[in-house]
A protein has these predicted regions:
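Alpha/beta hydrolase fold serine-hydrolase catalytic domain that processes acyl esters and thioesters
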Residues: 1-24, 45-183
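Gly/Ala-rich beta-loop-alpha elbow adjacent to hydrolase catalytic centers
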Residues: 28-33, 37
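Short glycine-enriched nucleophile-adjacent loop
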Residues: 37-46
Length: 183
């Protein structure tokens, strides 16, 4: 399993913080930071994982199929709260075991990735009953593409897709098929 540098750094940072802070903690991240937060907690020693009350993943991509059977990851699944907007794109990349919590965004397309567009009432995010058809289409398409690829091709494809979705050239699903950068 390939570990990206930011994941290793986050794991070390979490360990360093918990050496000086004695209490329980909540760990959180948005986008790639959400993936990194989940990784850091899951790959830490059990004594550290036990001090983490919850891991908040705000529309971070998931993990490879192989990672889903990692004992550290499996042990923290009940602690993970993954939030995605109803038209999620980034959060549909790769796989996860934890259920997603779908929240209402006042934006469309990739602009829903901005957590400041997620609607709240009081102290709660407004929930939506389901993902949009476009988000579900992206999820199914990615699963089909990834299933037919070798490990190195999957890594390249996921990195390229993430870069494309976060480049600003994608506003709606159709832009993925015809990115402005390729025209």
């Amino acid at each position: 399993r390939q570990v990206i540098p930011s994941q290793a750094l986050a794991k070390q940072y979490l360990q360093d913080v918990l050496m000086v802070y004695p209490g329980p903690v909540r760990v959180s991240g948005h986008s790639k930071g959400g993936n990194i937060a989940v990784y850091a907690v899951s790959q830490s020693a059990p004594v550290i994982r036990n001090r983490v009350l919850e891991v908040y993943n705000q529309e971070g991509p998931g993990f490879s199929q192989e990672f889903l059977s990692d004992p550290g990851y499996v042990s923290i699944v009940p602690k993970i709260k993954t939030y995605v907007p109803q038209g999620s794109m980034i959060g549909m990349i790769l796989y996860r075991l934890e259920p997603i919590i779908i929240v209402k965004s006042n934006q469309t397309g990739i602009m829903q990735h901005d957590p400041f567009s997620w609607e709240i009432c009081g102290t709660q995010m407004l929930r939506m009953p389901a993902l949009t058809s476009g988000s579900l289409f992206l999820q199914r398409t990615l699963e089909n593409w990834l299933a037919g690829m070798g490990r190195e091709d999957r890594i390249r494809m996921v990195n390229t897709l993430y870069d494309l979705l976060t480049s600003g050239d994608v506003e709606v699903m159709e832009d993925i098929l015809q990115p402005k950068s390729l025209m």
